[in-house]
A protein has these predicted regions:
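Conserved N-terminal catalytic core of the sugar/cofactor nucleotidyltransferase
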Residues: 1-9, 32-100
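Glycine-rich N-terminal loop/short-helix segment of MobA-like nucleotidyltransferase
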Residues: 1-29
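Conserved alpha/beta core of the MobA/IspD/sugar-nucleotide pyrophosphorylase nucleotidyltransferase superfamily
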Residues: 2-7, 155-219
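Hydrophobic packing residues within well-ordered alpha-helices of enzyme cores
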Residues: 18, 59-63, 206
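Conserved beta-strand segments of alpha/beta enzyme cores
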Residues: 25, 69-71, 186-188
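Short, surface-exposed amphipathic charged segments that create phosphate/polyanion-binding patches used
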Residues: 84-92, 137-139, 201-207
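The conserved acidic donor/metal-binding loop of glycosyltransferases
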Residues: 102-106
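Conserved core of the sugar-phosphate nucleotidyltransferase
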Residues: 108-181, 188-190
Length: 219
């Protein structure tokens, strides 16, 4: 049986490291805004909540032009809070199970739906590629994720993809999600093919990554 739940897209941030004066949701990859690609990816998901903050009106207009039934949540404190605050706001409008998707993350469609259909609380891991990775340390090198840190390197990076009960995603604080998750470890994990956009080099890599998939994440 296919899993159920709500995808919460955290799209409230200012994307300052890209230097484009745009929220990452509106930054174009292969000619389309990132959030448009994400909504293509989520075409088979019924419940989607988009959390907005910086340039909220522009993001809302774009989201609703593509997916009129999407729910919108607001993080009015986007300038002084982290992704965990946005995830908490979005979780208030979600069902019992939440899949958290950062607004700067593009995920291979097949891998995303494999992740979606995991019934347990789970993290999405990949090999480290970003400039400021959150490293995932595994029990005995291959078991559950037992530690998340930006200080000690490992062969795995948490890409920000998370599936968990709503009571977990709504209570991770107002800073970094990985900091809030520490009290909920250990967690299961699967690997995902994805690209995260933090800086201009990541943006160029995202374009190449998406071009390899025909320029689209739609089904």
């Amino acid at each position: 049986m296919q899993a159920s739940g709500t995808v919460v897209i955290a799209a409230a941030g200012m994307g300052t490291r890209l230097g484009l004066n745009l929220p990452k949701a509106l930054v174009e990859v292969e000619g389309r805004p990132m959030i448009a690609h994400q909504l293509d990816l989520l075409s088979d998901i019924e419940d989607v909540v988009v959390v907005v903050g910086y340039r909220a009106r522009q993001v809302i207009d774009l989201v609703l032009s593509i997916r009129p039934q999407a729910l919108i949540a607001f993080n009015h404190d986007y300038a002084s809070t982290g992704t965990a605050a946005s995830l908490s706001k979005g979780s208030q409008a979600a069902g019992d199970r939440v899949v958290a998707l950062d607004g700067d993350l593009l995920v291979d469609r097949g891998d995303f739906y494999t992740f979606w259909n995991c019934n347990e609380a789970v993290l999405g891991l990949t090999r480290p590629t970003t400039g400021r990775p959150v490293y995932a340390h595994l029990h005995d090198g291959g078991g559950h994720v037992v530690r998340l840190t930006q200080d000690d390197t490992s062969e795995w990076e948490w890409c920000g993809l998370l599936a968990a009960p709503r009571q977990v995603t709504a209570s991770l604080g107002s800073g970094h999600v990985f900091s809030g998750l520490r009290s909920h470890l250990p967690l299961d994990w699967i690997t995902v093919d994805c690209v995260e956009v933090d800086d201009p080099d990541d943006l160029a890599r995202a374009g190449s990554w998406l071009a390899e998939r025909g320029g689209s994440l739609s089904g």
